Amino acid sequence: MDNYEFSELLKTLKNKVGNIASIIKPENIQTRLKEIEELENSPSFWSDVKQAGIIGKEKTKITNLLKNYENAFNALNDASELFDLANSENDTETLEALFNDAPKLEDTITSLEISMLLSGENDGKNAIVSIHPGAGGTESNDWASILYRMYLRFCEREGFKVETLDFQEGEEAGLKDVSFLVKGENAYGYLKAENGIHRLVRTSPFDSAGRRHTSFSSVMVSPELDDDIEIEIEEKDIRIDYYRASGAGGQHVNKTESAVRITHFPTGIVVQCQNDRSQHKNKATAFKMLKSRLYELELMKQQDSANTGEKSEIGWGHQIRSYVLFPYQQVKDNRSGEAFSQVDNILDGDIKKMIEGVLIALKAE
């Protein structure tokens, strides 16, 4: 990097921070934080625990947003002032240090962008994630299990907690279906970027001839809804099936019909839960999963998305991302256009940077 390139980078980053400031309005955030502080000092504030909780979450979110803005603004100003000073004094050592720190400065601005992009109504909520293998039997089942592990490792890296709601093992390998709840700040905000079809190209470990195979899995992500959000489900529109739990689940497996499956006829959505020993609890969780999926579907309709939320046949033309392990190694996201060669790291859950690239690209559309 030279003086001209760094100068151009500063201009780009200043424009970016200026645009963000015009959207988030830092002065309005400061005013709102003062209002919340006054509310918290009111004796009656804590009498409504539910409302206090809602305001508490708002305070945390906008405090973090303001902090990220101030960090970015100050870092950019400091770098700009130091650059001007070093230039005027022809201080090559300081200039070299600034050039070396340029990626760190860009990361600071990216953190601000992401905190702004995750300020939506549902972004701070927990996420319900379902993975369904496409046609292809063992090969696709194995790919679904690889994706499942990738998300578990991502959640571990981010400090998110995971609760498995439904897990159905594949007959030979992998899994037939899995649904899990991810708990943590902005869990849905991040994982919503994973909604879609994921394509894998590799030499199959299940093919004795060592031929190249292409597999698909569908990932569906919806926000876990608060209890106060009303989603009307008519009894005539659903069928509830009870069956014996299978797979890893403890001593109660295959002894009682504790597992619950709900089919919603108007949309074709099917949810199932076998997480608990209690049929009653599994039924309540399955209804919660269904409501979240219906809510996500309605959001997509409101956004005039071409995808109505019902995944078409899992196959060509619908994937959001391709993972190529053979004949070369690359993961490419179709929405951001970004390609990554560190395939092993990505499959081990190092997907945050890739997700952030998607969030920024989708916002720019």
From Swiss-Prot:
Q: What residues bear N5-methylglutamine in this entry?
A: Q251
The disulfide bonds in this chain are none
What's a Pfam family in this record?
A: RF-1
The species this protein belongs to is Campylobacter jejuni subsp. jejuni serotype O:2 (strain ATCC 700819 / NCTC 11168)
Q: What does this protein do?
A: Peptide chain release factor 2 directs the termination of translation in response to the peptide chain termination codons UGA and UAA.
Gene Ontology CC terms, in alphabetical order: cytoplasm
Q: Which PANTHER family match?
A: CLASS I PEPTIDE CHAIN RELEASE FACTOR (PTHR43116:SF3), PEPTIDE CHAIN RELEASE FACTOR 2 (PTHR43116)
Q: InterPro entries from the xrefs? A: PCRF, Pep_chain_release_fac_I, Pep_chain_release_fac_I_sf, PrfB
SMART domains in UniProt: PCRF
Name of the protein: Peptide chain release factor 2
PROSITE patterns xrefs = RF_PROK_I (PS00745)
What does the UniProt PTM comment say about this protein? Methylated by PrmC. Methylation increases the termination efficiency of RF2.
Q: Which UniProt keywords apply?
A: Cytoplasm, Methylation, Protein biosynthesis
Location in or out of the cell: Cytoplasm
**Keyword Heme applies:** no
Family under the similarity heading? Belongs to the prokaryotic/mitochondrial release factor family.
Single GO molecular function:
translation release factor activity, codon specific
The protein's predominant localisation is cytoplasm
